[in-house]
């Protein structure tokens, strides 16, 4: 079942100053497009997903991915760092998958001590909403299973999380093998191949069973005919 994102929210994350409600983007049914001028937060929006999924963020200055744990100070809102002694930097995503709703949040607490800004380690919070009950997922292995298999599966991430400069690396048209792999991943060809193999196997078994039953019926009919002629 596909993942359907319901909302994405930020809290004091880069230029998204303020709480989650102030920086929440509710998605509608169908394709949702995030459009903005330069330096208005599109790359930071992207970094929110990267932080959740891979604990990395894209540094536009060095034009390279950085470990998020080493970039937390830079990830914090500049306005929050100036105006608040205590604040939280976080990203929250609400999504549905196979009839179950999930809320995933990653955050770090910031504080100023003797004029020096410090922060806690980043933390993950996942809640499953099902049958009118909210169930916190506390086990780290279960959390990673939801992130890597339910939210955005690992195999789809190279195609689901793209920046412009990534397109040339995504599909190598000069390589038949690379192109085949891309098509296989996006279209689920391997799944269809598996279904075809199962269907062929079942067809062979059905044909063999039919021939066996037909042979038995033919033998029985001959026996009945001989009995009638006696």
Regions from the PLM with identified roles:
Residues 30-31, 130-133, 164-170:
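Short hinge/gating elements
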Residues 164-230:
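Extended, Lys/Glu-rich alpha-helical coiled-coil stalks
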Residues 29, 85-91, 119-123, 154-158, ...:
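Short glycine-/polar-rich loops that comprise or flank the Walker A/P-loop
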């Amino acid at each position: 079942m596909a993942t359907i994102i319901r909302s994405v929210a930020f809290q004091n994350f880069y230029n998204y100053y303020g709480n989650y409600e102030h920086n929440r983007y509710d998605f509608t049914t169908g394709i949702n497009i995030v459009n903005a001028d330069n330096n208005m937060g599109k790359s930071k929006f992207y970094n929110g997903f990267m932080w959740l999924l891979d604990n990395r963020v894209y540094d536009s200055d060095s034009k390279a991915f950085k470990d998020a744990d080493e970039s937390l100070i830079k990830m914090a809102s500049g306005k929050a760092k100036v105006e608040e002694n205590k604040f939280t930097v976080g990203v929250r995503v609400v999504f549905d998958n196979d009839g179950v709703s999930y809320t995933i949040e990653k955050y770090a607490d910031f504080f100023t001590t003797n004029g020096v800004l410090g922060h806690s380690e980043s933390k993950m919070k996942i809640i499953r909403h099902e049958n009118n009950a909210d169930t916190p997922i506390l086990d780290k292995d279960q959390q990673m299973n939801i992130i890597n298999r339910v939210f955005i599966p690992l195999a789809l991430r190279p195609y689901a999380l793209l920046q412009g400069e990534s397109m040339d690396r995504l599909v190598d048209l000069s390589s038949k093998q690379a192109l085949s792999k891309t098509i296989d991943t996006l279209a689920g060809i391997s799944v269809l191949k598996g279904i075809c193999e199962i269907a062929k196997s079942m067809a062979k078994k059905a044909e063999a069973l039919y021939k066996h039953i037909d042979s038995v019926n033919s033998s029985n009919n001959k026996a009945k005919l001989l009995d009638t002629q006696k």
